[in-house]
């Protein structure tokens, strides 16, 4: 008798995705982050669901409801900090996942790559709206500053901002709709993840060499299921340590003060995972220019496949491109540091230099170095 997992209409989909899926035999730990992101999403949806049972999206009670969760709800503090630090873990895994894609040429699967960029935007939007919900000082002012950027759009900007706010400032209407969207978006993300995997399974996984691996495939289960479970354990241990030992390490102390529209915090800044984009935004003195640079800092990933000039797919055997890749990582770390600093010298000029180098590296240096490597290999 044929195994039920191969004949049952539902089980055979799961079987062909997670059990009998042929996978390259040489996948390194950098291929673990996809499954880790799945775990992060599950953790966020579950903790978020339980938090939503106790949270109230009203300006008068939002801050107090979060305090109530932490003080009065059984293990509410664990839920709250798992959710807040789970977002940080989510973005760490996201950035490493994207970095892996850039390094090993996974962007050549353009459909999977483009859905991934869409996912990145969706997760960023979700995280931004979630940060507004506790209704602390940084929640309120972060929402005011970032939504206000849309007013830079010519002609419709001001109307658009007021439409998003639901009034003439960030207020009750804004908080209520942000809660509604913050609840909805993770499910849209989950649907997009399905599409992401659908397109990935059309082509099969890439591998570290960038060479087609059809001649050397192994079943996903047990090899990669065990490997993924080890990844889960390591990540969940790190997340637990963060939640139980220093839950506020990555947060902003200003958010423990209730939102006050009459008192601006000395330094308005987003969560750490948006600081690189915030630094790029601030490095351009013009409002519209800054907004465009902010969007392009992520959207530039969409044109990376068009800029692939190398005869090889992966950077595994391209030392010059590897140097540029790590240079790009250093630039992003520099931008993250600058995003958290006040707008004064020398930070302004460092941020502007790093922003220019970020775009130059992706758009100019990498394609040129790839062409140079082709010539060095006499290809």
UniProtKB/Swiss-Prot annotation:
Disulphide bridges, residue numbers: none
| Gene Ontology MF term list | metal ion binding; ubiquinol-cytochrome-c reductase activity
> Where along this sequence does the record place binding of heme b b562?
83, 182
> What is the recorded membrane topology of this protein?
Multi-pass membrane protein
Listed A to Z, the keywords are: Electron transport, Heme, Iron, Membrane, Metal-binding, Mitochondrion, Mitochondrion inner membrane, Respiratory chain, Transmembrane, Transmembrane helix, Transport, Ubiquinone
Q: Which PROSITE patterns match?
A: CYTB_CTER, CYTB_NTER
Transmembrane residues, as ranges? 33-53, 77-98, 113-133, 178-198, 226-246, 288-308, 320-340, 347-367
Q: Which InterPro entries match?
A: Cyt_b/b6_C, Cyt_b/b6_C_sf, Cyt_b/b6_N, Cytb/b6-like_sf, Cytochrome_b, Cytochrome_b_C_euk/bac, Cytochrome_b_N_euk/bac, Di-haem_cyt_TM
Q: What is the effect of changing residue 253 to Q?
A: In strain: Isolate TK 18667
**Variant or mutagenesis effect after changing residue 288 to M:** In strain: Isolate TK 18667
Annotated cofactor note:
Binds 2 heme b groups non-covalently.
Source domain of life is Eukaryota
Changing residue 235 to K does what? In strain: Isolate TK 18667
Q: Where in the cell is it found?
A: Mitochondrion inner membrane
Binding residue positions for a ubiquinone: 201
The GO cellular component terms are: mitochondrial inner membrane; respiratory chain complex III
GO biological process, alphabetically ordered: mitochondrial electron transport, ubiquinol to cytochrome c
Which family is this sequence assigned to? Belongs to the cytochrome b family.
Which PANTHER family has this protein been placed in? CYTOCHROME B (PTHR19271:SF16)
Protein role: Component of the ubiquinol-cytochrome c reductase complex (complex III or cytochrome b-c1 complex) that is part of the mitochondrial respiratory chain. The b-c1 complex mediates electron transfer from ubiquinol to cytochrome c. Contributes to the generation of a proton gradient across the mitochondrial membrane that is then used for ATP synthesis.
Q: How does it assemble?
A: The cytochrome bc1 complex contains 11 subunits: 3 respiratory subunits (MT-CYB, CYC1 and UQCRFS1), 2 core proteins (UQCRC1 and UQCRC2) and 6 low-molecular weight proteins (UQCRH/QCR6, UQCRB/QCR7, UQCRQ/QCR8, UQCR10/QCR9, UQCR11/QCR10 and a cleavage product of UQCRFS1). This cytochrome bc1 complex then forms a dimer.
Q: What else is known?
A: Heme 1 (or BL or b562) is low-potential and absorbs at about 562 nm, and heme 2 (or BH or b566) is high-potential and absorbs at about 566 nm.
Q: What is this protein called?
A: Cytochrome b
Q: Which gene encodes it?
A: MT-CYB
